[in-house]
Amino acid sequence: MAGCCAALAAFLFEYDTPRIVLIRSRKVGLMNRAVQLLILAYVIGWVFVWEKGYQETDSVVSSVTTKVKGVAVTNTSKLGFRIWDVADYVIPAQEENSLFVMTNVILTMNQTQGLCPEIPDATTVCKSDASCTAGSAGTHSNGVSTGRCVAFNGSVKTCEVAAWCPVEDDTHVPQPAFLKAAENFTLLVKNNIWYPKFNFSKRNILPNITTTYLKSCIYDAKTDPFCPIFRLGKIVENAGHSFQDMAVEGGIMGIQVNWDCNLDRAASLCLPRYSFRRLDTRDVEHNVSPGYNFRFAKYYRDLAGNEQRTLIKAYGIRFDIIVFGKAGKFDIIPTMINIGSGLALLGMATVLCDIIVLYCMKKRLYYREKKYKYVEDYEQGLASELDQ
């Protein structure tokens, strides 16, 4: 109990204050200056120069609109001679920050509601009606089974289904891509950005871009880095892939627009930087369900008034426009906070040198004696002298 009281008294009735001791030591002096220089280099070089710790920052707010141009020609036995324009291959016409360009297609023409044989596969091939379950509809089925086994061709029988007939046969994807000419289509990206904290706005069609230039330019990282018109084949090429290979089964491409701006400089120096990458994983070894595709239909009625449709399985490339960026501008508050933090860090040099001198060096006991001085209470000391 007495020990606890003594410890409590020592805690309550003692006070320590720093004492400046000048130690003439090359090792300690050099170490102290080296640590101080490292801290100064960190504060000035990293915090203020690289990270711009004197600036207030804001994240970009963005809007994007796109427009595709280009015409393709096909001549097949199924469709004959046909022209494909923007209304045919951009599906849907407008999306938020992205667009889909059809590059390949499987068409099933003149479908009507009726009964027809399924496409042969492991689950639909049959030998008798016993192999077909009436009323069943699997996840990969084109319709509802009638329970009958009917001839698909002269040598193969499959289960009959109630469906849109004839059913789609997507066993073989056309190669090369049906719209391989899409490689030369162009994409105009119009991007408006805003930094609300600084009330700063800009768009990627820069003030010096004229109508004449916009009609003739195509983006090139070296010759035309600020042209907002991109050739589709070049986008895929810049991401390290082949457009013709990607066009067969489709995929997803990212067009990245970076707006990192230093608003302490002229507004004309705040410029967009474009980069490209493929967003869907293309793993050759695990090539299950590759690419990008979806189905849609065009409905109409024949002369007799019967409903028909053309089923379209569209393969293509979806282009996602991804806008990101950060703007910074001088502000006194972050500047003072970082200066204060830097000054506080300089105290680390003294703490580190104290640890070395007082606990690691050979003369640590001598230095400790010089560093600390124990002083009794003046009033108690005076009373003791008077008693004597």
UniProtKB/Swiss-Prot annotation:
CTP binds at K67, K69, T186, N293, R295, K313. Changing S242G: Does not change ATP-induced inward current; does not change affinity for ATP. Activated by ATP. pH-dependent and inhibited by acidic pH. Residues 1-33, 360-388 are cytoplasmic. InterPro entries: P2X4_purnocptor, P2X_extracellular_dom_sf, P2X_purnocptor, P2X_RECEPTOR_CS. It comes from Homo sapiens (Human). Keywords: ATP-binding, Cell membrane, Disulfide bond, Glycoprotein, Ion channel, Ion transport, Ligand-gated ion channel, Lysosome, Membrane, Nucleotide-binding, Receptor, Transmembrane, Transmembrane helix, Transport. It catalyses: K(+)(in) = K(+)(out); Na(+)(in) = Na(+)(out); Ca(2+)(in) = Ca(2+)(out). The chain crosses the membrane at residues 34-54, 339-359. Glycans are attached at N75, N110, N153, N184, N199, N208. The keyword Disulfide bond applies. Disulfide bonds join C116-C165, C126-C149, C132-C159, C217-C227, C261-C270. This is P2X purinoceptor 4. It comes from the Eukaryota. GO terms for molecular function: ATP binding; cadherin binding; copper ion binding; extracellularly ATP-gated monoatomic cation channel activity; identical protein binding; ligand-gated calcium channel activity; purinergic nucleotide receptor activity; signaling receptor binding. One of its GO terms (biological process) is positive regulation of microglial cell migration. ATP-gated nonselective transmembrane cation channel permeable to potassium, sodium and calcium. CTP, but not GTP or UTP, functions as a weak affinity agonist for P2RX4. Activated by extracellularly released ATP, it plays multiple role in immunity and central nervous system physiology. Plays a key role in initial steps of T-cell activation and Ca(2+) microdomain formation. Also participates in basal T-cell activity without TCR/CD3 stimulation. Promotes the differentiation and activation of Th17 cells via expression of retinoic acid-related orphan receptor C/RORC. The keyword Transmembrane helix applies. The gene is P2RX4.
